[in-house]
A protein has these predicted regions:
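Non-catalytic interaction/Regulatory regions outside core domains
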Residues: 2-139
């Protein structure tokens, strides 16, 4: 049931990104505060190798991804969403690939050019909120 809820949230969020381009994009991210950690990626093209690697890793590590309440906001250069959020995260000039991890508290936890998901999991697992989640898991 929890998986269905998480997946439903992810699908609704993806639909919102494309359907509501006039809504302030910071508001879209605020919807996830306290419920999800958000990986925002900025890529210069859909075929960007770092972007594709991250998407592949999300599928490969889907259980670990869901366990950490992650959602992925995938932004391609030239779109309205990219423009708005790149300003919010102070991206300047041409960006080949940039990944920003936002914690459940709404704060930026990581800004990197790496798309290594296991490294992101390791970082998340050191966060106080995640440590509390681990202690309450029943597996």
């Amino acid at each position: 049931m929890r998986r269905l809820l998480v997946r439903s949230r992810q699908l609704i969020f993806a639909a919102c990104l494309f359907a509501i381009s006039s809504q302030p994009h910071a508001e879209l991210l605020k919807d996830y505060k306290l419920t999800n950690r958000v990986i925002v990626t900025f890529s210069n093209a859909e075929s960007n190798s770092d972007r594709l690697l991250l998407i592949q890793q999300i599928k490969l590590y889907s259980c670990q991804y869901r366990k950490r309440d992650l959602v992925h906001v995938d932004l391609i250069e030239g779109t309205e969403q990219y423009k708005h959020l790149s300003r919010k995260f102070s991206l300047t000039g041409h960006t080949h690939f940039k990944l920003v991890l936002i914690g459940k508290d709404g704060e930026v936890k990581l800004s990197t050019t790496s798309s290594n998901l296991p490294d992101i999991f390791s970082l998340i697992d050191t966060m106080p909120m995640r440590k509390r989640e681990i202690h309450s898991e029943k597996c």
